[in-house]
Design a protein with these regions (language model features):
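Gram-negative bacterial Sec-dependent N-terminal signal peptides
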Residues: 2-28
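Gram-negative and organellar
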Residues: 29-467
Length: 467
């Protein structure tokens, strides 16, 4: 991997100088600039992060690679609803652009050979529409990303020696699912997330039409699993699209019980025959019946819960024991205002998804808890904790860059502190501890389960100015 210290230091110096100038001229800027109502967001942020393991390796083979990461984050957002007047059906009609320009500097290049550059420019666009007309209400949200990163994926292998050589070591290919996530997110790709709702209310009842999209269009090149590409990560494109209807009944003024139905399709790109002889892939269609509850049972608590059976139909080339299983889907979002200056938020999701590198579909679980405390008007504390799990035990495929029968888990703990010098300028300091762990203890020694365990720590210092 190319060391880009000079370029990064220039970017750091220019960014920090710009923030300093803004800080020095805060009073003058406040007098000269008053944002119109249709410009709710105008900001500039810069952060510096030290990451001690950017590829999430165990250290048994490849040495963990450290890096200094500089992130420049301007942001601008428009809301055109105020221009339409109070009689218009729109409460929100917003568009924003919040890019990140990210530069990696490696103090010592510990890669066993040349890895691709990890620098990237994340061009992020957001669209939000919300309104009502009579008994109808509607909303649309869309988050689109073009990530201008490397078109070459990383290679998880200490060397490219043939297996007959006693020094051969490509065991890092058995890395955790969660070790591979950060470098994959830095690669060249498109992402799109969309959610649309249209609701009609009649007395205590309502009917709601929904649609949702999750799309990953990967632009990285494919390579065979042969030298010099043993351990190279081939990233297939993936998507999930679904639509359906919810029926709701308000058992209390602000609480409703719901019954929903979804029909959806998941797509996983099949690797070309010239790249992989294994012709498996895990595209499927599914139907879900969801039981839920939503609303505010008390003024300090807001919730939205849904869960139920997932009836899955996999394509005939899916490497699973049952092509028509009944699985589970569940999600929850709960937010509590504990006191006037403390809040707690919990998010949960379990669902069936397709693999980002392999063939076997995964059962994906995520539990996230976030606590926030405004100690004073200027000083705030945050504490976040998360557990994620990727379970691939429904499959039988032992081919590919690594056997697919596995269950990986990641634990995250992330405290942070924020101090606001002014309503416009604030500084933040945060720490994140990530621990990956193998959760399938029946994995044979030949699959080197110890290579799935890793620790990754990050420390970040950031400044942001909001005009």
């Amino acid at each position: 991997m190319k060391i880009n210290l000079n370029k990064t230091h220039v970017v750091q110096a220019v960014s920090l100088a710009g923030i300093t100038i803004i800080f020095a001229g805060t009073a003058q800027a406040q007098e000269l600039l008053t944002k119109p109502d249709w410009l709710p967001q105008l900001s500039l942020g810069v952060s510096e992060t030290y990451d001690d393991n950017i590829f999430g390796v165990s250290g048994n083979g490849m040495t963990p690679q450290e890096a200094w990461i500089t992130r420049i984050s301007p942001g601008i957002g428009f809301d055109f609803a105020p221009l339409l007047g109070s009689q218009a059906p729109f409460q929100t009609l917003s568009l924003n652009y919040t890019p990140d320009f990210v530069f990696f500097a490696l103090p010592r290049d510990k890669a066993p050979y040349n890895e691709p550059s990890q620098d990237y420019d994340a061009h992020k666009f957001g669209l939000a529409l919300k309104g009502s007309a009579g008994d109808f209400s509607f909303s649309l949200s869309n988050s689109f990303l073009y990530n201008d990163g490397s078109r070459a994926a990383p290679t998880y292998a200490l060397n490219q020696l043939p297996s007959s050589n006693p020094l051969a070591n490509q065991f890092d290919k058995y890395r955790s699912q969660f070790a591979n996530t950060p470098p994959r997110e830095r690669a060249n790709q498109f992402q799109d997330r969309e959610a649309t709702l249209l609701q009609y209310d009649v007395d205590k009842f309502f009917i709601r039409a929904t649609s949702a999209l999750l799309y990953y269009g990967m632009n990285t090149v494919f390579h065979t699993n042969k030298a010099p590409y043993m351990g190279y990560q081939n990233y297939p494109s993936r998507d999930d699209v679904n639509g359906g209807t919810d029926l709701g009944y308000r058992v209390l003024t602000n609480v409703a019980l719901t019954l929903g139905y979804r029909y959806g399709s998941q797509y996983q790109q099949q690797f070309p025959a010239s790249i992989a002889s294994d012709r498996h892939y895990s595209s499927s269609t599914y139907q879900q019946v969801l039981f839920g509850a939503e609303g505010r049972p008390w003024h300090w608590l807001e919730m939205k819960l849904a869960g139920g059976p997932d009836f899955r139909d996999y394509n005939p080339n899916t490497p699973v024991h049952d092509l028509h299983p009944t699985r589970y889907y569940g999600e929850a979002a709960v937010a509590a205002t504990i006191t006037t200056n403390q809040s707690l938020a919990f998010k949960y999701k379990q669902w069936n998804w397709v693999a980002s590198t392999g063939y076997v579909p995964e059962f994906d679980s995520s539990y996230a808890l976030n606590y926030h405390w405004n100690a004073t008007r200027q000083l705030g504390f945050d504490l976040a904790a998360q557990i994620q799990e990727a379970d691939y035990t429904s499959g039988y495929d032992a081919a590919g860059t690594a056997p697919s029968i596995r269950a990986d888990r990641e634990y995250t703990l992330a405290p942070g502190i924020t101090y606001a010098f002014t309503p416009q300028l604030s500084v933040s300091l945060s720490y994140a501890f990530n621990a990956g762990n193998n959760e399938l203890y029946t994995i044979p020694a030949t699959s080197h389960p110890a290579y799935k365990n890793f620790i990754d720590q990050m420390v970040s210092l950031g400044l942001i100015y909001k005009f």
